[in-house]
């Protein structure tokens, strides 16, 4: 169906102002009163409708990624990977797919300065011929916790104190002291990359491992990596304070203005590929979202390019109501066993139904651009006009049938029902390797962030000692530097 045929009239359809019901409005300034100074009458229908509509203009903000900006464009395949996947939108070089991309900060609220230290969201919706594929990632390749049972607590710890509504690092460091696997993400969070100069100059990662499946049914694990063609640029703390004090929407403005003048942002997409049979070769679990895949062993393969060449037409309709879901995949792609990814498949759809409504997938920005059909019907704010008599399947009166089968990974799984920690935690090695890859001045900025936040008077000696231990296990000299500036001895 074409949603535009059934949408309410807009101001452009009539030469004069009307109510929602189409009735003419001849005075949009003065309320209906008893005399010039009398009480306002409830029978002023236009006034009541106008106020009631205004009261309901806003929807609940996202629990995470509330502050964001969107843009449209296309993804173009530049390198043949048809031997790895049967996904139609990746079928051959030159194939283009329309996309919408949303950049965001993770923790901070809608309207907060875009210059604050935070992980940035990098979410891409591909409108393919086989349905939507949502690659919902960030500008860092890892996350704080590997199991979704800790996710609500993770976000609560990062968000403001519920009593004062102030973000406080004593809460953050207290909670994550129980999650040693979080140190690797802090090696990104306290690094320069979490102060990107804008959205155009930051990398993007799919974060989770997915699977690519070819026509023969052979599956490979895959990780996605976006690299900006204009390079990665970050701010110092001082620059971030200055930029945020000048314009709290600097990154949104930069993105919008760049596209408006034809300076289109572009990213190259590359992938890591891993044969499932090689998973046990590593000293870490490759499906652990707190780990990266080493490029020297699993080099990046080029796939395509992402170009953003159109600004959105309506911020509310195409940014606030834009909804992503890691569960949206297409034939030739599949999920991995990553515990956090598995639970995001449920959580994202659930939060969109709460935030936007049960029929959020009918909104033009979320609906697939290919032909689609199912028997999901009615519900609050349904605006799809349907006149068929058969709303079930199968039926001899309706030609709708099952789609042709496509390959999905098939493995024999066995094990006991249990709640357990993965075998290869290896919580500190990659954090240390990242620290040692930096120049001394970058290392010093990282150490300074730890010293700053561990110096909070509400951070106890026990919490400081735990973090010094974690840092020392990642890199002995890093732990010593932080400890010496805190007048604490590192413990192993």
UniProtKB/Swiss-Prot annotation:
What's the subunit arrangement here?
Homotetramer.
Task: Give its E.C. classification number.
Answer: 1.11.1.6
What does the sequence similarity comment in the record state about its family?
Belongs to the catalase family.
Q: Which reaction does it catalyse?
A: 2 H2O2 = O2 + 2 H2O
One short Pfam family name for this protein? Catalase
List localization entries: Peroxisome
What keyword terms does UniProt attach to this protein? Heme, Hydrogen peroxide, Iron, Metal-binding, Oxidoreductase, Peroxidase, Peroxisome
What is the source species?
Nicotiana plumbaginifolia (Leadwort-leaved tobacco)
Q: What processes in GO biological process is this protein linked to?
A: hydrogen peroxide catabolic process; response to hydrogen peroxide
- The entry marks the following residues as binding heme, namely 348
What's its job? Answer: Occurs in almost all aerobically respiring organisms and serves to protect cells from the toxic effects of hydrogen peroxide.
Q: What is this protein called?
A: Catalase isozyme 2
- What's a GO cellular component annotated to this UniProt protein? plasma membrane
Coarse class of the protein's main subcellular location? other
What Gene3D superfamilies is this protein classified in? Catalase core domain
Q: Which domain of life is it from?
A: Eukaryota
Q: Which SUPFAM superfamilies match?
A: Heme-dependent catalase-like
Any single GO molecular-function term of the entry would be: heme binding
Q: Which PROSITE patterns match?
A: CATALASE_1 (PS00437), CATALASE_2 (PS00438), CATALASE_3 (PS51402)
Question: Which cofactors is this protein said to need?
Answer: heme
Active-site residues per Swiss-Prot or TrEMBL entry: 65, 138
């Amino acid at each position: 169906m074409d949603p535009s045929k059934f949408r309410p009239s807009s101001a452009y359809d009539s030469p004069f102002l009307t109510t929602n019901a189409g009735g003419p409005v001849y005075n949009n300034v003065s309320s209906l009163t008893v005399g010039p100074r009398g009480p306002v009458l409830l029978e002023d229908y236009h006034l009541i409708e106008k106020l009631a509509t205004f009261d309901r203009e806003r929807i609940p903000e996202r629990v995470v990624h509330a502050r964001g900006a969107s843009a449209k464009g296309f993804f173009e395949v530049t390198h043949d990977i048809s031997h790895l996947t049967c996904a139609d939108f990746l079928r051959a070089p030159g194939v283009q797919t329309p996309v919408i991309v949303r950049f965001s900060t993770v923790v901070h609220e809608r309207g907060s300065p875009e210059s604050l230290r935070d992980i940035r969201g990098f979410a891409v919706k591909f409108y393919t011929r086989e349905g939507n594929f949502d690659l919902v990632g960030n500008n860092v390749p890892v996350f704080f916790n590997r199991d979704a049972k800790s996710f609500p607590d993770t976000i609560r710890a990062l968000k403001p104190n519920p009593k004062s509504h102030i973000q406080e690092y004593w809460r953050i460091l207290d909670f994550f002291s129980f999650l040693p696997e979080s140190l690797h993400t802090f090696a990104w969070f306290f690094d320069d990359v979490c102060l990107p100069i804008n959205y155009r100059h930051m990398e993007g990662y799919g974060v989770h491992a997915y699977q690519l499946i070819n026509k023969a049914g052979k599956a490979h694990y895959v990780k996605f990596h976006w690299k900006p063609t204009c390079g990665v640029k970050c701010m110092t703390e001082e620059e971030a304070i200055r930029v945020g004090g000048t314009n709290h929407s600097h990154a949104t403005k930069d993105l919008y203005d760049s596209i408006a003048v034809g300076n289109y942002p572009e990213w190259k997409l590359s992938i890591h590929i891993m044969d499932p049979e090689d998973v046990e070769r590593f000293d870490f679990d490759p499906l652990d979202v707190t780990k990266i895949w080493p490029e020297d062993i699993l080099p990046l393969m080029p796939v395509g390019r992402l170009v953003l060449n159109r600004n959105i037409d309506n911020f509310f309709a195409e940014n606030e109501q834009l909804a992503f879901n890691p569960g949206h995949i297409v034939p030739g792609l599949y999920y991995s066993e990553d515990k956090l990814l598995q639970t995001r498949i449920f959580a994202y759809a659930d939060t969109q139904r709460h935030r936007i409504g049960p029929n959020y997938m009918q909104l033009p920005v979320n609906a697939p651009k290919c032909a689609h059909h199912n028997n999901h019907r009615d519900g609050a704010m349904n605006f799809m006009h349907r006149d068929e008599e058969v709303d079930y399947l199968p039926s001899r009166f309706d030609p709708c049938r099952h789609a042709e089968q496509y390959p999905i990974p098939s493995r024999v799984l066995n094990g006991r029902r249990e709640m357990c920690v993965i075998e290869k935690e290896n919580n500190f090695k990659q954090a240390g390797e990242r620290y040692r890859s930096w120049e001394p001045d970058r290392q010093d900025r990282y150490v300074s962030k730890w010293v700053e936040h561990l110096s909070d008077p509400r951070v106890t000696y026990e919490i400081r000692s735990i973090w010094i231990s974690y840092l020392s296990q990642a890199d002995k000299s890093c732990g010593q530097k932080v400890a010496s500036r805190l007048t604490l001895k590192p413990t192993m």
